[in-house]
Amino acid sequence: MKSLVLYSSLTGNTKKIAYTIYDEIQEEKDIKDVNELVDYGIDYENYDIVFLGYWVDKGICDKNSKQVLENIHNKKIALFGTMGASEKGSYGASIIEKIESIIPKDNEILGSFICQGKIAEGLKAKYKEMLKLSPDNEHIRQQLNNHEESQSHPDEQEIYEASMFAKNMMIKASIV
């Protein structure tokens, strides 16, 4: 079984998870940074499973990952991503649901993994400005509160969980 790990990473969080997944795959494999690809027309024909890693932008995957996902057909797909907020609760689940909904129906989604990543310093300043305009916006307030907590993410536990996710997806891909 041959695997392709694709990832888009703005701050290095998703790249860290991508290489954790890549290192866990024991069979033939390739890894590519979506943002370095000139043409999104990747030949998926030689791959049995595609792992696609994204970073969360405004409640969904980044635009380059979205473009790639919309152009994958007839493949087994495992999604992984990072987000500045905690992935726990309904917000993380809603992101996964939105992303899975943009994948063409001729693919088989094996599973999804999402974890918290370090929030970029530039976003902290942006959120402070946004909060001035919308002081009652709970999501923005959560992002600011999360900033300090996020600095250690993805942490050792999340790296371990990503590793287990990769193993489970490879097992699932070989069974289905």
Curated annotation (Swiss-Prot):
Pathway involvement of the protein, from the record = Porphyrin-containing compound metabolism; protoheme degradation
Which SUPFAM superfamilies does UniProt cross-reference here? Flavoproteins
Gene Ontology BP, a term: heme biosynthetic process
In terms of InterPro entries, this protein maps to: BilS, Flavodoxin/NO_synth, Flavodoxin_CS, Flavoprotein-like_sf, Protoporphyrinogen_IX_DH
- What terms describe the molecular function in GO for this protein? electron transfer activity; FMN binding; menaquinone-dependent protoporphyrinogen oxidase activity; oxidoreductase activity, acting on NAD(P)H
- A Pfam short name: Flavodoxin_3
**Role noted for this protein:** Together with BilR, catalyzes reduction of mesobilirubin and/or bilirubin to urobilinogen, a key step during heme degradation. BilS is probably involved in electron transfer for the bilirubin reductase BilR.
This chain's protein is named Flavodoxin-like domain-containing protein BilS
Source species = Clostridioides difficile (strain CD3)
